[in-house]
Amino acid sequence: LLTIANRILGTGQLSLAKFLWITADDTHHLHSNDIAGYFKYVLQRIDFSRDLHFYSNTTIDTLDYSGTGLNSGSKVVFAAYGDIKRELATALPELFHTNSLITHAAMVMPGIAVVQINPFTHYDNASAEIHNLENHFASQTECLQNLPLIVIADDAAFTAQSLHNFLWVTFTRCNPSHDIYGVRSFTQHKHWGCHGPLMMDARVKPHHAPALEKDEAIERSIDP
C-alpha cells in the first residue's frame, strides 16, 4: 500500500494532495466513490499506532494552501488493511458532555465525532486546549475504542449536518503536521502514532483565506 501511496503522491497534480486514505479489498466490492462506505471500511481496520505516515516540511503546495506559507506544508497517508478491529460507535459517549471546553458535540457518521470548542487563536493556545481534551479522553479510553476519529471544529452542528460538510471542514482546514493530535500519542524511532482516537483540529486558522460567500445584493441583481 505504501508503495502505491508514494506513487500517487509523486504523480503530477496528485502531488497536491495532503490527505491520502488508501486500503485494499480482496472482495473488490469497495469503491472510493462510496465515501461513507470507504471511511467505514478504513476506520474499522486502521491502527493509529502503526498506520499513519507523515511527510513534513515539504516544498509541495496543496490546493487549499492550508499550510503557513507557499511551498510549505505537510502530507499524511492513512494506510489500513486486514481484519476488522472494531465495530464503529453510532452514539456519543457521555464523556463528550463532561468537559468544559466542549460547547457542542455530534456524530458525523459511525466512528466519527465532531466537537466544538473556542475559536482558534494561535498554536500555543491550541496545544494547551488539545492537551486538555487528550487528558480528558485518555481517562476513559475504554469508552472510545469504537470511536477512532474526533474532529475539532468551529461549528459542530454544521460539520455533522452532512458528509459534504464534514469533508469540506475537516480536510480543507487541517494541516497534517500541525493539526493532527491523538489520545495517548507517542513518538518512537521517528514514527508518530496514538493508542486512542485520532484528533484533527479543523478550526479556521488566522492564515487561512476568508470564506468565499455569496453577495446577496449581487445575487438579487442577477435573479430572473
Residue ranges with predicted function:
Residues 1-224:
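Charged, compositionally biased interaction regions
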